[in-house]
Amino acid sequence: MKNFSQRASRLIYALCQDEARRTGCSRINPEHVLLAMVKSEDGLGFEVLKLLRINILTFRLSLEQNITSSADGITVDSDEIPQSRRMNKFIDLAGIESQSLGNEYIGTEHLVLSAVREADSVTAQYFEKAGIDLAEVRTAVKKVQSKRKSSIENHTEQRILN
């Protein structure tokens, strides 16, 4: 399943490219996606971070400090920076998380779940230090999704009634 929400697609195919270029990386990694998400302050994934009371500034700094540039022969100013193996696995895990929640798309919230699920990732370590486990993140995702569904339903009802 590679059916991305609009925001997730924008993060994965555009914004993280900018972050990889900015940090001098020759491959896209999950940290680039999360950094782009935090900077854009948009999407359900960002809402999940806020609901979990993640300090956005320290999380962003943690991501930035742990991104290492690499010089492996690929020019950073190329049109499209390729995804790393970790990034491919990250997307696969996001798909698994999406399916486990009964969703038919991969959204930014699933990207957060995937990042926390990757054992040695910067995000997983940050969340562990904050005392937040994967189950808590899933609960937060469900809350944010249900709020979104109810607001969409209310908006639709309003249009029908008017």
Regions found by a protein language model. Name each.
Residues M1-N162:
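Histone-fold recognition with a strong bias for associated Lys/Arg-rich disordered tails
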